Amino acid sequence: MNEKYAALKSNVSMLGHLLGNTIQEAHGDEILEKVETIRKLSKSARAGNQADRNNLIEEIKSLPDEQLTPVARAFNQFLNLTNIAEQYHTISRHCDAHVCEPDAINTLFAKLGQNGINKLDTAQAIRELNIELVLTAHPTEITRRTMINKLVKINECLSKLELSDLSYKERHKTEKRLEQLIAQSWHSDVIRKQRPTPLDEAKWGFAVVENSLWEAVPDFLRELDEKLKDYLDQGLPIDARPVHFSSWMGGDRDGNPFVTHTVTREVLLLSRWKAADLYLKDINELISELSMTKCNDTVRQLAGEDEHEPYRAILKQLRTLLSDTKEILDAKINGQKLAVKAPLQSVEQLWDPLFACYQSLRECGMSMIAEGSLLDTLRRVKAFGVHLVRLDIRQESTRHADVLSELTRYLGIGDYNHWSEQDKIAFLTNELASKRPLLPRDWQPSEPVKEVLDTCKIIAAQSREAFGAYVISMAKTASDVLAVHLLLQESGCPYRMDVCPLFETLDDLNNAEAVIKQLMSIDLYRGFIQNHQMVMIGYSDSAKDAGVMAAGWAQYHAMEALVNVAEQEGIELTLFHGRGGTIGRGGAPAHAALLSQPPKSLKGGLRVTEQGEMIRFKLGLPDVAVNSFNMYASAILEANLLPPPEPKQEWRDLMEVLSQVSCEAYRSVVRGEPDFVPYFRQATPELELGKLPLGSRPAKRNPNGGVESLRAIPWIFSWSQNRLLLPAWLGAGEAIQYSIDKGHQALLEEMCREWPFFSTRLGMLEMVYLKCNSEISRYYDERLADKSLLPLGDRLRDQLQSDIKAVLNVENNENLMQSDPWGQESIRLRNIYIEPLNMLQAELLYRTRQAGVVSEELEEALMVTIAGIAAGMRNTG
C-alpha cells in the first residue's frame, strides 16, 4: 500500500494479526493456514498471476462444507475491521491532506472572501441553514447492532493506541482489550437469525442517536460557533437549529405489512421515552456541575426564595419531570391503559428553565460555566426536541385511493377508482371545504382500509412536533395529494401536516411540475399548505426504470421545474431527496452531489434520507458525524451563496440526447433482452437474498412479479454481489460514446470542466467502474448460469470495458479515480479480501442449487459471504 497511508496500513495489519490469533485459538492451525493461503493467492491473482488465480479457484472448490463458514467469516470479519480502521483513519491525527479534506467550513469562508460575498449575506445564510437528515432502516445495513457496538469500541481502542505518551501498562491494557473485542466479534453471530421487526429497526435508529448524534450535534455547533466568531465576529445564535433528524423506522409502511398503526404508536412512545432518558442523563450531570449560589431575579423566582443552590433546585424539578415522563411512557409501552398524559409535552418545558439558568450565569459573571455542558444541553433540546427524531409516515398512493373507493361505493355515489382525475379533484376539494363529516358512523371498512384510517387517527392524536412529513409513494396526480389531506382532516388532525408527493418513475418525474402547478391553482389547497410545499424526488426507482443517466437528468429537470413553479407561485419549497448508498440509488459524495443540483434548489434547506449502511459510515461515530455535518453545511451554504452556473442551452440539448440514448440502451437489455431475467436470476444471488434476514420489508412489492416488481434495493444489491453492478452504469457510457461518434467530444469535455452536474455524474461512474470486476462476474456466469446465457454476460462485460474507455476519454484521464487517490486506495485495499468472498459465494450458490435441499451449514456460510461482500463494497444498496 502507498506509504502515504502507513498509519492506516499499520492498523489494518495489527487488526488482521489479532483476528488471525482469534481464528487460530478457535479453529486451530488448519483453518488459519487455509485463510492465509487463500489471501495470498487472491493478492497474487489481483496482481495478474493467472496460475495463482486458477489455484485460488481450485483451493475454494476443494473446501469441505464444514470449512466454508469459518473461512467466509474470516474474510467477512477482516472487511469489517478494515472498514473501522479506514473510518478511524479519516478522523485520526495521522490523517493527512491526501485523505482528509481541509476543514470544509473554513475552506468555504476563504472562497466566499475571494468571491467578495458580503459577510451580512453569509450571516443570514447561516441563520437560515436547515439540514434535516432522515434515518431509514433500509435492509442494506447488514451489520447487526451487537457487532456495530463492538466496532465502536474497537475504534476507541485505536484512538487510545495513537497516543504516543501511553505508559507500557496502559498500552498493554488497550491492546488486550482490542484482542478481547475481536474475539467477542468472532464468537458472535455475524448476521441476524431472524428478520428484524420494525420495532427493532427503530431501536437501531435510537442507538445511532445515543451512541453518536447526541454527542456530535453539540460538538458540531460548538465548532461552527467558533469558526463564525473568527470569520464574522458573531457566533451562532443560541437557539439555532441547523441540523435535526427524522426517521422512517416504524413509519414507512409502503409495501411493508409489518408496519401497522400499533407499531407506529409504539415507536412514537419509545422515541419520547428515549429522549426523556437521554435528557435525564444530561440533567443529572448538570446537577453535579451547577452548584453556584449567585443568580439573577428570574432564576431566584423559579427556584424559590429559600433555595441556597438555585440552579440545582431548578434542575431537580426537571429531573422529576423527566423521571415521571419515563415512568408513564414505560407503562404505556407495556400495554397499561393510562388516562394520564406524560408530563413532558413540549420543548418549552425544557428550554425555558435551562435558558433562564444560562442567562443568569452569564449575567452573574459566570459565562465560562454557562458555555459548558449547559449550552450543549440547550443545543440538544433544539435539535432533538421531546421526540428525539420526528417520524415520517410513508404510504403508497393506491392505498389512499382504495379507502375512498370503498367509501364512495358504500355511500352509493360510484367507485372513486373509476372516476376521471377531474371528478376526483372536484369531489376532494368539495369534501375538504365541507363542514360535515364524510365518514358514516355505521360504516364497517375492510381491514386494509381500516389500517389506513387508524394510522391517520394516530397522527391526529399526537402533536405536530412528533412528525416530519406524510410521504405518498408512487404519487402521480394532484388527487393523490388531496386524498391524504382529506383523510387526515376526517381523522380530526388539528394541524398542518407536510403532505409530500414522492415522484419515482421517469414519467412521474417528468410530470411533477404539472402536478404541483395544478395543486397551486386550487385556492383551498393553498390555504391548507400555508405557503409551504414539500416534494420528494425518488432516485432508486427512477434509475431502476430508466438507468442512471436518464434518471439523473430527469431528477435535475424535475427539481429545476419545481423551483421555478415555487418562485412563480410565491411558495416555499423543500425538496426531499430519497438517495441510497449506491449510484443506482442516487448515492454520491455529499458535497459533490449537492453542488451538482440546479441553482436555488437548496434555498428551502436540505432534507435527505440517510439509508441503511450509510448511516453507520457517515454518522456512526461522533467525529465522523461532525465531519458529515460540516460537509453538508458547507455545500448548502456554497450552493446558496455561490450558486452553480445555469447550464447552457447546448449542454441541455446534449443532455437530452444522452438521456434518451442511455434510456433506450438500458431498457433494450433489461426489458428487451429475452434472456435477461433468467440470466439475472442465475448469475446473481437474487433468489437467495430473499431469505436473508435483513430489513423488515419483503424484497418484492408483488411476490409474483418479475424484475419490475423487485424493490430497487434487492435489484441493486444482487448486482453488487456478483461485481457487475449493472444498474449503476448500464446505458450511460454507451450514450457518451454515441455523442462522441456524432462529433460532440469537445462539448462533452466542456460540460465535464464547467458543469458540476455532469462532472459529478462521471465521477460517480468512475467509482462504480473501479468496483466492478469482470473476471469475478464471468466466474459467477461460468459456475452458475446455463451455457446458453454466457454470451449475454460476455456482451455486458464488453460493453462495460467500452464504457470505461468512453468516460476516461471525455475526462482526459488515463486511470479511474486518478483525481481521488484516497478513494482509489480504499477500494483497492478491500478488493483483496472481497474477491475470496466472491469466489466462496459462487461456490456456495453452486452447491446449494445443486443440492436442492439446503443444509443449515451451507446457508449460514452463504449469508456470511453476502454480508461480507456488502461490507467490502461499502455502498451496497
UniProtKB/Swiss-Prot annotation:
One of its GO terms (biological process) is tricarboxylic acid cycle. Belongs to the PEPCase type 1 family. It comes from the Bacteria. Gene3D superfamilies: Phosphoenolpyruvate/pyruvate domain (1.20.1440.90). Its EC number is 4.1.1.31. One of its GO terms (molecular function) is magnesium ion binding. It is an enzyme of class 4 (lyase). Keywords: Carbon dioxide fixation, Lyase, Magnesium. It comes from Vibrio vulnificus (strain YJ016). It catalyses: oxaloacetate + phosphate = phosphoenolpyruvate + hydrogencarbonate. Its cofactor is Mg(2+). This is Phosphoenolpyruvate carboxylase. The gene is ppc. Transmembrane segments: none annotated. Pfam families: PEPcase (PF00311). Forms oxaloacetate, a four-carbon dicarboxylic acid source for the tricarboxylic acid cycle. The active site is at residues 138, 544. GO terms for cellular component: cytosol.
